[in-house]
Amino acid sequence: MGNCLHPAELSPSTQNSSQLNSEDLWNFSYDGNDSFPDVDYDANLEAAAPCHSCNLLDDSALPFFILVSVLGILASGIVLFMFFRPLFHWQLCPGWPVLAQLAVGSALFSIVVPILAPGLGNTRSSALCSLGYCVWYGSAFAQALLLGCHASLGPKLGADQVPGLTLGLSVGLWGVAALLTLPVTLASGASGGLCTPVYSMELKALQATHAVACLAIFVLLPLGLFGAKGLKKALGMGPGPWMNILWAWFIFWWPHGVVLGLDFLVRSKLLLLSTCLAQQALDLLLNLAEALAILHCVATPLLLALFCHQATRTLLPSLPLPEGWSSHLDTLGSKS
């Protein structure tokens, strides 16, 4: 069979036996003066050999999954604590309820990372794996949609600006994200104790729907935001979507959406890879894109902290001080 680094090699005895059996069958089946073109059995056997790829996210990657999960939970918890503590003034951030939901989505993703991690034993059920993929992609879809709304509406998402707007958008966006996870939830399960998507002809429609959803949310949505920003600026129609550091979130999921779409095209035979090296490169890109997407649960709280720090540093000097603070400062000034 070979391994993931070296293709399978046939021993001389295997090659000779294969040639002998084929020649015997040929002579037995046809008896006459018909001439047939020569067949290169060695080339045929080499072409039929399986293509092996190294899986970067195998059992040896378990420490990576655990570390990212722990860091993501801690970072998201700290960010949520700072959002709901008036001492840090993070509630001054424009659209802070939406930003808090981004931290919630990141925390949910961090929690299910160990469920889908390899190397934790062979006791996971298909139901648990389906639930894991549901939360995995549901939280990611919700975060992407929340970022799109935050960029499009910006300061209008404040609780005092439009009452009920934030609540209605939140319910709607999380509902859409839940619906988008149905295909991958139904087309995933446990195989050999590992959680993995199930690829079969019966589930091809679900796989196609999931690939299209990832392409639309992770790839087309940020491209649309950038396009709208550039178009409005070129036509002088206003500032367009609100661009800020939070847009860096899409860097972690954009490759996943692209490579997942390519993988579906290859599995559906709509895109043919002529060499084993091309297939190995695609498998490597799939693993790297998945690892990058997993890292978003650590990066998202950091992006939120940076954004809120910049926003509060800009807004705090322009806000009036409380009466107690102002009188205290006046007393200190008179003493000096």
From Swiss-Prot:
Signal peptide: none annotated. Disulfide bonds join 51-276, 129-195. Glycans are attached at residues 16, 27, 33. GO terms for molecular function: C-C chemokine binding; G protein-coupled receptor activity. Its main location: other. GO terms for biological process: chemokine-mediated signaling pathway; inflammatory response; regulation of chemokine production. Residues 85-95, 154-166, 229-244, 309-336 are cytoplasmic. It comes from the Eukaryota. InterPro entries: Duffy_chemokine_rcpt. The keyword Transferase does not apply. The chain crosses the membrane at residues 64-84, 96-116, 130-153, 167-187, 208-228, 245-265, 288-308. Keywords: Disulfide bond, Endosome, G-protein coupled receptor, Glycoprotein, Membrane, Receptor, Transducer, Transmembrane, Transmembrane helix. One of its GO terms (cellular component) is recycling endosome. It is a multi-pass membrane protein. Belongs to the G-protein coupled receptor 1 family. Atypical chemokine receptor subfamily. This is Atypical chemokine receptor 1. It comes from Papio hamadryas.
